Amino acid sequence: MVDEELFDKSSNDHSISSEEEDMLVRSYSNLNVSFGYHCNSYQCFSLDTDEYDISPNKRLETNTMMTSQNGSFTCLSGAAISANFTLANTNICKGLIGEEILPELDSPNSFRKIVSSPSMSRLDLLSTSQGSPVSTESSIFEISKNIWRSSAPTTVSSNFLTSTEIKMAGGAAGEDRVQAVCSEKNGWLICGIYDGFNGRDAADFLAVTLYDNIVYYLYLLECRIKQENGLYGSPEGSLNGVKSELTLAMRFAENEDVKFSETFRAGVLKCLTTAVEQAENDFLCMVEQEMDDRPDLVSVGSCVLVVLLHGTDLCILNLGDSRAVLASVPSSGMDKLKAVQLTEIHSLENPLEYQKLLADHPNEPSVVMGNKIKGKLKVTRAFGVGYLKQKKLNDALMGILRVRNLCSPPYVYTNPHTVSHKVTEDDLFVVLGSDGLFDFFSNDEVVQLVYQFMHDNPIGDPAKYLIEQLLLKAAKEAALTAEELMRIPVGSRRKYHDDVTIIVIILGNAQRTMTASTSL
């Protein structure tokens, strides 16, 4: 259900003292992840923090913020800070994820080109490392891989998610992981926030597999659309690998009847859902194979938030309590901003989720204990956390770690919430955040903070700014100075705030953004 909040655009004053500003500048070094991406009329460029300082005392000297009228976004920024102490996970999948794949993918401070092979994906490597197919339920997945390989290298160059010019940024903060992938030529953006718990193994697994899963299933959708709409052999359907047939299909959908457009968008959402289901099957299969050595893996899980943006189409999937919040100005001309929550809250704090859980287990008085599912977990839908889904995985745990009276699993579900939104001229930006952000700010407060900041700092970094404001508020609530809070080591700091991961996407073109920024 879409949640909307209205408030006055000019209601808050966000000035800070010079002491606080000095602390915030120093806090940049404590960010685990901080990246930015700006688009212009011809290309997008990465903001490498080694080259650019976007601190309160220094601004980028550039006039290349103008984007094409067809651009899906003007710029984005991402930032993350840890509070949980988490060891780097190097041993799942025989160490392949931690030792080989993640070092290749992680780029916490800038976007960089993805090095990929048309003949062997990261998922192939994982299958090889385990000596068998990653999942026992991979028939569709195997078909997609066969189609992929039979068409290489043409397929790889034609699919937007594997074109040679895509760039990725991301990294880890405590148990969280964040990724952002952009295809400059095809105008696609995909972002993921994976809020892990009981360890980071599940979030790490998502970071190295979910993107590839999305690639495969969108490619299958691409093939089906080409067949159904006669794009094979047409001039538009053969661009020598410059643009994606899926991009062409999207444009075709925009120019055709509403029924076709809705069917196409439903297909994209289905691809995202199937990609998560595939990752879930693969992860639990891996857990079952390795739980003799790592029984703790059965309790590891992650929330999932994925956003795919192309043109005016915004597709969102979520499991758990991370949020995507859209900021827009009503076309009526009212001097109000509107915060629209595009995601659902899958936790016991949501009455609908609470009642569904009880209804699914009507004869169990101990389903919820201490405001947690079986006394263990607050989120009702999540990736992984196999011991609350399968009895055999729960049996791998010893003593007090094992869930007693696991009568009718699953108790945690994997069916995600999905939604597609047609971006309009009223929509300004989208804020993606793990629940750590919303522990301190409501949806309307988040939108107001970003709006005011972008008005005062049109080429600043709103994701960093949100984390800075969160740290100030956390310190104030704990009766500490901001500097004292920053001195508390990771692990102990979890008493004051959670791991926090944020992505802010400024939608549309610079003309719209500048108009919104000067409307106060």
Swiss-Prot record:
EC number: 3.1.3.16
InterPro entries, A to Z: PP2C, PPM-type-like_dom_sf, PPM-type_phosphatase-like_dom
GO aspect biological process, one term: signal transduction
Class of the enzyme per the UniProt entry, highest EC level: hydrolase
Catalytic activity reported: O-phospho-L-seryl-[protein] + H2O = L-seryl-[protein] + phosphate; O-phospho-L-threonyl-[protein] + H2O = L-threonyl-[protein] + phosphate
Record-level Gene Ontology MF annotations: metal ion binding; protein serine/threonine phosphatase activity
Keyword set, alphabetical order: Hydrolase, Magnesium, Manganese, Metal-binding, Protein phosphatase
Residues the entry annotates as binding Mn(2+) 2: 195, 435, 498
Binding site for Mn(2+) 1: 195-196
Protein's UniProt keywords contain Hydrolase: yes
Free-text comment on the cofactor: Binds 2 magnesium or manganese ions per subunit.
Pfam short name (any one): PP2C
Domain PPM-type phosphatase: 160-507
Cofactor(s) for this UniProt protein: Mg(2+); Mn(2+)
Family, per entry: Belongs to the PP2C family.
Protein name: Probable protein phosphatase 2C 39
